[in-house]
Amino acid sequence: MDYVIRPLTPADEAIVWEMLYLALQGSESSTPPPPEIVRRPEYARYAEHWGREGDRGFVACDKGDNGILGAVWFRPPPEGTTPVLAFAVRPGHRKLGIGAALLTQWVRANPQQDEISLKVQPTNPAVRLYERFGFKIAQQSDDAVTMRREI
């Protein structure tokens, strides 16, 4: 599959919302949550008014039809809290290297980011991908793993 990775722009807010919903769906075998879950304040803060100062991210697009394959993005958090990286790859396009390419692009573009975290379901195979990029398990419960990367 040929794809291109480009920066997310303010015009891509709809893509960020779509990818946020995919990120919240969890594993492909779980029942997806209702689409309106993204409007809950604890999740909407990752997408609402995308393109503000400090918002950074990348999207992978199919070279053939320009379809969205995945995205990785970051929004500066309130002072004193660890920043959270949001990340999603569309089902059917996972395990093809797209996630690794997105994370590589994000890490290269943000060398000054000395601390970042992400949350993932413990059964998600992407845990191994995150570990390859230096993320380590910081907290674990039955339904979520918080991973942190420090440089």
Task: Please state what every model-predicted region is.
Residues 55-57, 141-146:
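Short hydrophobic/aromatic beta-strand or adjacent loop that forms the aromatic wall/cage
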Residues 94, 117-128, 143-150:
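Conserved beta-strand-loop-alpha-helix junction that forms the acyl-donor binding cleft
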Residues 10, 21-92:
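Acetyl-CoA-dependent GNAT
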Residues 81-82, 109-122:
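Conserved GNAT acetyl-CoA-binding A-motif
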Residues 89, 95-108, 131-132:
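Conserved acetyl-CoA-binding loop-helix of GNAT-fold acetyltransferases
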Residues 131-141:
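Conserved acetyl-CoA-binding loop of GNAT-fold acetyltransferases
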Residues 1-14:
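Conserved N-terminal entry element of GNAT/NAT acetyltransferase domains
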